[in-house]
Regions:
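HhH-family (HhH-GPD) DNA N-glycosylase catalytic core used in base-excision repair
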Residues: 2-166
Length: 166
């Protein structure tokens, strides 16, 4: 619930029930196969968000045959956190929703929490531009830099090892 941007589990459950006309507990009880063909998550961020700068970062640091930026989307192949099998993810920007769309293909659904946290960290979605703007407003030099790129974030790699070699 908290990763989806809700302040409480009760609010999440209410929104879930309105959207899908059933309680989340009923969905959890369905126990279908744990490998999803594909799952889509919307990971919210606080605007502004400089998607072009983020994709340029990942494009310039991409590890060949593992990750790439194509058609304004970030793609990555990885070994699933739970079953060790190959999976694929795709991240695109939904600026009208202030969210990134995370599409996961072939992963065990138990890996979704881990993956969503990793993508939130990689794309710096926890950043608060208003807080940064207020802090930088105190120093004219920093204020000028911030105003040039107000949606700039600090992206990072998949792992510290990959960050070191890319």
């Amino acid at each position: 619930a908290f990763n989806s941007g809700f302040n409480s589990i009760r609010r999440f459950n209410d929104a879930f029930q309105k959207k899908f006309a059933r309680k989340p507990s009923l969905i959890r009880k369905l126990k279908k196969k744990s490998i999803a063909d594909s799952v889509v998550l919307h990971l919210r961020y606080r605007p502004p968000y400089d998607w072009n700068a983020i994709t340029e970062f990942f494009k310039s640091h991409a590890i060949s045959r593992i990750e790439c930026v194509e058609n304004d989307c970030y793609h990555r192949f990885f070994l699933d956190h739970h079953n060790g099998k190959p999976a694929h993810l795709k991240v695109s920007n939904l600026p009208h929703e202030n969210a990134l769309k995370l599409e996961v293909f072939g992963a065990d659904t138990r890996s979704l929490f881990w993956l969503s946290r990793k993508i939130r960290r990689m794309f710096d979605l926890e950043s608060d531009p208003l807080l940064i703007a207020n802090a930088f407003a105190q120093t004219p030099f920093l204020k000028k830099l911030y105003n040039k790129s107000p949606g700039l974030r600090i992206p990072c790699g998949w792992s510290p090892f990959e960050s070191a070699i890319s």
